[in-house]
């Protein structure tokens, strides 16, 4: 069984919500990434999302764009990201790792070789932001051959027809984009988000995890009251880079934010 499914089953059995942090591989410097991954697990992460740096990250706001620029300045590419996962797997064989990014670097790498190398390194799935599910058949077949999960995006504007298609092809869970815009956006309106989320939830055969715009423990808990889980990216990267630039400890800063989110989410009580 894929580590993602094992984790989701465990969360359901324990009546807990998923917490998934996102970091960009190689940001702020390559040697920190594996230690950050371990720190985030220690601080309550259920699933790790590791970003593959890309020069044109169209879905990202300025925080993650700058993170990718810093990583690319260190010449971080697919092989480097896979090596980071290999290092992580030496001491953590249970926490799911999802690679999140864009199609171009993987296409250049070669789909079959990438999937083979990713699974060998210990990757459990991918989120390819610019690959619509209707155009993903070729990639999906290769991923299935190697046992790599495809995590798809859905949003308030996703049609019922597209949700039906996603239901036929997705694995693990869906990444629910909470609002129109880019990562790190400010305009999260909870009543509207809840209503739209519940519409998509009713159409989905898989758990829906909410990302985009979740910045504080309070906001994470409010979303987790109705959602299957939350994903935090830009807020976490802000903590990491601010600590690094202030010559403080990025591990402590990122761990403190994630721990507070974990506690806030767990304090909402039983799953609804």
Curated annotation (Swiss-Prot):
Source organism of the structure: Legionella pneumophila subsp. pneumophila (strain Philadelphia 1 / ATCC 33152 / DSM 7513)
GO molecular function: tryptophan synthase activity
Record-annotated active site: 49 (proton acceptor), 60 (proton acceptor)
EC number: 4.2.1.20
Family matches, as InterPro entries: Aldolase_TIM (IPR013785), RibuloseP-bd_barrel (IPR011060), Trp_synthase_alpha_AS (IPR018204), Trp_synthase_suA (IPR002028)
Protein's UniProt name: Tryptophan synthase alpha chain
Pathway field: Amino-acid biosynthesis; L-tryptophan biosynthesis; L-tryptophan from chorismate: step 5/5
Gene name per UniProt: trpA
Alphabetical UniProt keywords: Amino-acid biosynthesis, Aromatic amino acid biosynthesis, Lyase, Tryptophan biosynthesis
């Amino acid at each position: 069984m894929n580590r993602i499914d094992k984790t989701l089953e465990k969360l359901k059995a324990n009546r807990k919500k998923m917490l998934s942090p996102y970091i960009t591989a190689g940001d702020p410097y390559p040697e920190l990434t594996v230690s950050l991954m371990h720190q985030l697990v220690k601080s309550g992460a259920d699933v790790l999302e590791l970003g593959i740096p890309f020069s044109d990250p169209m879905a990202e706001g300025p925080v993650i764009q700058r993170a990718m620029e810093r990583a690319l300045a260190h010449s971080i590419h697919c092989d480097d990201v896979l090596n980071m996962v290999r290092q992580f797997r030496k001491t953590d064989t249970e926490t799911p790792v999802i690679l999140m990014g864009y199609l171009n670097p993987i296409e250049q790498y070669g789909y079959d070789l990438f999937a083979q190398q990713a699974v060998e390194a210990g990757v459990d799935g991918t989120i390819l932001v610019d690959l619509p599910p209707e155009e993903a058949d070729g990639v999906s077949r290769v991923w299935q051959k190697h046992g790599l999960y495809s995590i798809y995006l859905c949003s308030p504007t996703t049609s019922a027809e597209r949700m039906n298609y996603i239901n036929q092809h997705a694995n693990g869970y869906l990444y629910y984009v909470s609002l129109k815009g880019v990562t790190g956006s400010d305009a999260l309106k909870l009543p509207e988000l809840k209503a739209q989320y519940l519409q998509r939830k009713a159409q989905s055969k898989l758990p829906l995890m909410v990302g985009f715009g979740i910045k504080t423990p309070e906001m994470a808990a409010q979303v987790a009251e109705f959602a299957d889980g939350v994903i935090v990216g830009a807020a976490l990267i802000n903590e990491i880079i601010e600590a690094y630039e202030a010559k403080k400890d990025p591990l402590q800063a990122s761990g403190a934010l994630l721990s507070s989110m974990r506690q806030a989410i767990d304090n909402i009580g039983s799953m609804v």
